[in-house]
């Protein structure tokens, strides 16, 4: 469960390394977001010379959380870190590579391009 002011690692090569959540999209009083949800973030740290700069406000989709996610068949899946992928306004990823595994719920949430770039979909 990701809430306002949570820090997430960036799982793509857009240039940002870490982001902080400013807002959870999807409701006026929404407190938490999970895998597949869109969030608005501020970049905490970025690689030098990248297009994405520190302090820039960006949109991202959550791809990994440390909180377990219950699936329809009763199984649970959780990851060792919280991570997000930066996206453009048309829900396509800003980077050209995705690092680490992602949950298959990302594809079901309408982010098929992110799922196709990922090295492993769990």
From Swiss-Prot:
Keywords noted in UniProt: Ribonucleoprotein, Ribosomal protein, RNA-binding, rRNA-binding
Presence of the UniProt keyword Cell division in the record: no
Superkingdom as given in the UniProt entry: Bacteria
MF terms (GO), sorted A to Z: large ribosomal subunit rRNA binding; structural constituent of ribosome
Biological processes, Gene Ontology terms: translation
SMART domains: Ribosomal_L14
SUPFAM superfamilies: Ribosomal protein L14 (SSF50193)
PROSITE patterns, per database record: RIBOSOMAL_L14
Record InterPro entries: Ribosomal_uL14 (IPR000218), Ribosomal_uL14_bac-type (IPR005745), Ribosomal_uL14_CS (IPR019972), Ribosomal_uL14_sf (IPR036853)
Cellular compartments per GO CC: cytosolic large ribosomal subunit
Stored Pfam families: Ribosomal_L14
Listed CDD domains: Ribosomal_uL14 (cd00337)
Entry similarity comment: Belongs to the universal ribosomal protein uL14 family.
NCBIfam families listed in its UniProt record: rplN_bact (TIGR01067)
Subunit structure: Part of the 50S ribosomal subunit. Forms a cluster with proteins L3 and L19. In the 70S ribosome, L14 and L19 interact and together make contacts with the 16S rRNA in bridges B5 and B8.
PANTHER family on file: 50S/60S RIBOSOMAL PROTEIN L14/L23, LARGE RIBOSOMAL SUBUNIT PROTEIN UL14M
Role played: Binds to 23S rRNA. Forms part of two intersubunit bridges in the 70S ribosome.
Name of the protein in question: Large ribosomal subunit protein uL14
């Amino acid at each position: 469960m990701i809430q306002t002011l949570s820090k997430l690692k960036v799982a793509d090569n857009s240039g940002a390394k870490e982001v902080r959540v400013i807002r959870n999209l999807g409701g006026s009083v929404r407190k938490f977001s999970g895998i597949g949800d869109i969030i608005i973030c501020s970049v905490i740290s970025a690689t030098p010379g990248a297009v994405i700069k520190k302090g820039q406000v960006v949109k991202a989709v959550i791809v990994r959380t440390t909180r377990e996610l219950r699936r329809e068949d009763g199984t649970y899946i959780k990851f060792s870190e919280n991570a997000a992928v930066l996206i453009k306004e048309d829900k396509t990823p800003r980077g050209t590579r995705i690092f680490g595994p992602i949950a298959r719920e990302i594809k079901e949430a309408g982010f098929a391009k992110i799922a196709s770039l990922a090295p492993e979909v769990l």
